[in-house]
Amino acid sequence: MDTLVDVVRLGGARFDRRPALLIRPFFRTRAWRYRDLAETVPRAARVLAEAGVGEGDRVILWAVNRPEWGIAFFAIAHLGAASVPLDVRHTVDFGRKIAGQTGAKLVVASRQTETSARELGLPIVWIESLPDSARRAKPVEPAPVTGATLAEIVFTSGTTGEPKGAMLSHGNLIANATAMAQVMPFGEKDRLLSVLPLSHLYEQVLGLILPLTVGASVVYPVSRQPAVLIRTFRDFKVSVLLIVPQGLRLLDAAIERRVDQADRRATFERLHAIARRVPKPFKRLLFRSVLSQFGGRLHTIGVGASALDVDVATRWTEMGVDMLQGYGATEMGPVISFTRPHRNVLGTVGEPIPGVEVRIAEDGEILATGPGRFAGYWKNPEATAAAIDADGWYHTGDLGAFTKDGMLTFRGRKKDMLALPDGQKVYAEDVENALKEDVRVRDAAVVGWPLGPGLKVHAVLLLDDSEVEDEIIAAANLRLAPHQQIRGSTVWPDEDLPRTTTLKVRKPDILARLEDLERPASAPIPAAASKVRREALDASVDPVTVIVAGLANVDPAAVADTAHLSTDLDLDSLQRVELLGIIEEETGVFVDDDALAPDATVAELIALVEAARDAKRGVGAWNWPLSPLVRAVGIGFQILLIYPFVSLFYRVRVSGLEHLNPDDGPYILTPNHCLHLDNGIILSRLPLGIRRKLAVAAAADTIYDNLLQGVLASVIANAFPLQREGGVRKSLELLGARMDKGYNILIYPEGKLTVGGPLQPFKAGAGLIAVEGGTPIVPIKLKIHRMSIIDRRRFPSALRGDVELVIGAPIWFDIGTDHATATTQLEAAVRAL
């Protein structure tokens, strides 16, 4: 396996029907099997080629994590082109700069980045619709790529400075992934939850390429809120997680809250004390109830991007989860060292991975080389020469040392870059330049300063007038990206900043002095909170405000409706996600984090919560009819009872069975509803391969208003209740759960029985199910040539009627198709049979 093309091709051959990429965007899981990837990627490459992409071109990939990101990434590689991934949080200015530097031909974007992507002035392919477009395209042969072919250019996250693009080849990425396959306990039965941005090489290599080389599955959550993540863990039985330290703390905090809410703190701490003295299997047994909240399969968490909190890591280790930490750099493809489960020393970043060499320079800098090392920076020979020495060693700019046991320890950054707890990187020079654009600033220095468990961007200013401090910070933040926002500031009291003999600012001296100054950012209440209006609150204070205040560590009386979550209350991107998770836990209301703007006000958050109160997620499984015993009984009833009964009253002819292939499902079958026995006719005449995996959506208000009738329907027809009015979300979740298990769905789009016809207008929900189901829709028409006495129910009538069951060709609806349009097209397809 030498190239990304090989990953897809060999994966399809080796792992075939195993699920590769999974996501549940609405009521049903969309899954791409390994064979699907092998078939879809060459077709998606055709779509990109027809949009103007050729061998050697660059394509900007600016989209959120989802399976289609991987499809686009591999399709670009298939053409011999290079991906240029951008973080969804990057600014338009940054995107323009990268597009200009690389001469990109195209941008692949998602709906979350639509506004920014359009500003680049390049042709756009929408990532959500790429698989649909690929399905209609012919596959294209792969370009003659080799391990040395450029696969992608990954740019630093600096916004106001000149970003550098690290050039990574196919061989760099494959070498790092295959080396990590020897380090991480990863296999075909594992499922990894992808939460870190795929634009970051750590997630891309360890969270996408590596799993696909070993036959594992990658699950994409629809939100990063802790409550949603935990539900995703549970629903998909996730076993491996890659995360940044702050994200780990969010999950840990969610567990701690549940412990306190259940009043089990003393018991919880006793279990931890016992766990320190027993082997891993017993640890997992002690914390079985906690781990079951995560699906019961979680065994490994890999942490990267910034320093791991040893106390938090210890808590997870005591629960029987291996806590592994890595160190690396984009320029090394990216992993340099990683701890091993059998040699895991918390507080270190482990040993060099196979094939990578590491040495410590005389000044303490970490130097590395190996097959993952990049070739250089895009069109920047000066920066390349500064990073790679004559002997081929990459100079990381980081300081470290080896322990006597050969473990690498990270001691800080030689270069002036801040690693925030959410994994984002901020170059101090970029923020300083934004501050210095203001003529009122004589000089500025930016440092990372502790606030709670992580670092915040803190500005130290030399001003003639300290009264303008807040104005200067606010103006600079308008020019900075969300992750670069200045969270605290200090006016330097001396005439000048401390400097070296060469007049460089001495930031260690600044950090030491900040301890004694009046407004350090390390105060328990964020400095920015002082800007919030402090008004007395009465007993009717909104509970959302109380939750916000608790997370921001401020008095609720200090939180005004006009306070901005980011700039006033210092909540970074992951803290805003945590906020929505706490709101869901405490109020039962789910708010999609995509709906919350980075700098939304408290009032806007409250409005979002109120708007979402009527959209609470339903629960319920109705799983008992799916048990093998019940299904065997049901199929027996169909063969021994339903078939002869239907045959007594109707002669049934069937056409179109060639359109049904059990391997291409699950299908959604949409017949007209014109006879009392139409359910029996369909159930008894469909092929057994389809029927044994068939579930019927039955009207909850008619079939399930009688207990005996509902039980019989569930046993014989594998029916489940579908609400025609209200409670729709729960019904859709029941429908989706069956499709996720491979069941075909029989649903009557008219919504009611009209004996003898004519065909009634289809309900609007039919289009929603057809589009969001993401599966082939099979139109079916029951043609009545002569009605039986059982349906006509009057004399004189024939005892035995004559009907024809016509099965049409499957129809696919593209993601994004208007639901009303889909309903109209589906109705027309049934009428035309």
Regions found by a protein language model. Name each.
Residues 31-35, 151-177:
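Conserved AMP-binding A3 loop
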Residues 21-52, 57-66, 70-74, 91-96, ...:
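Conserved AMP-binding/adenylate-forming core of the ANL superfamily
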Residues 46, 88-119, 132-136, 176-193, ...:
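Conserved ATP-dependent adenylate/AMP-binding module captured primarily in the ANL superfamily
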Residues 656, 692, 708-711, 740-744, ...:
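A cross-family acyltransferase "interaction/gating" segment
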Residues 107, 360, 370, 375-376, ...:
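AMP-binding/adenylate-forming catalytic core of the ANL superfamily
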Residues 174-191, 198-284, 288, 297:
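Conserved AMP-binding/adenylation subdomain of ANL enzymes
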Residues 17-19, 138-155, 162, 185-191:
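Conserved pre-ATP/AMP-binding loop-to-beta segment of ANL
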